[in-house]
């Protein structure tokens, strides 16, 4: 891979990283300020803040991986640093996906209209248990990732002990195929929350269809607040599903480099696509949340006023 292509993709990745940090930091900052002001936090704000923090960490890990690939390519052949990066990438990836799934589940229970006793019971208790669900997602992600990381590091530790007795440096390498297969297994686990999110999406569509049908039969129109809430929730869920599919394909592209030689370009390109998912989805969430949307418009208006004031002062001085 030429230096020109490396530099171009790296700068594009830095740009995506900056946009993603800006959007997710804005979500976290607005919700935390509201939390301090009101001394309590709503369930939806807690989910969005947790999701924003996990995605900030995910963006940092992906960008660090890009830098390591470009500046220290030998680390991808062997080394403990690679395993550490992979562990935190997989962990933050799992947390981000689980938290996004929690958001989809929350939308489903708060907006959908079903009359099954179990659904009504869950709908009534969702605000009380959402913090425990988020905590459970964190614990589950850590327990899934730690054993796999220990398996990867076991060979490394055995090699260090062997090197003290012999000079077998070749034994300190974990094969690329073994490493890639472990990463593939860890990311296949994310298909579970993806399936849950997909199920909530279809149930929301069913609820919306039934609601519109009732509105048509009662001749009250279809653009009532409940319909608008359904549409906003569906936009947030379907954007997550589409971006997650693109993210998963980018991961498969990056993982292919472990089996095909000389594919650093595929890795960087895959990571460039991977950055789109945590970066762009944050802005979709901002536009779909009334409080965040108002705060963003207020910030935008303030920035425009400052810029206009500076231009006026410069024109006055001239």
From Swiss-Prot:
UniProt entry keywords in alphabetical sequence: G-protein coupled receptor, Glycoprotein, Membrane, Receptor, Sensory transduction, Taste, Transducer, Transmembrane, Transmembrane helix
Any Pfam family: TAS2R
PROSITE patterns reported in the protein's UniProt record: G_PROTEIN_RECEP_F1_2 (PS50262)
Main localization of the protein described in the UniProt heading: membrane
Subcellular location: Membrane
Record topological domains on the Extracellular side: 1-9, 77-94, 150-187, 257-266
Note: Several bitter taste receptors are expressed in a single taste receptor cell.
Family membership: Belongs to the G-protein coupled receptor T2R family.
GO biological process: detection of chemical stimulus involved in sensory perception of bitter taste
Organism: Macaca mulatta (Rhesus macaque)
Cited function: Gustducin-coupled receptor implicated in the perception of bitter compounds in the oral cavity and the gastrointestinal tract. Signals through PLCB2 and the calcium-regulated cation channel TRPM5.
Name under which the protein is recorded: Taste receptor type 2 member 7
Entry-listed glycosylation sites: 167
Record-linked InterPro entries: GPCR_Rhodpsn_7TM, TAS2R
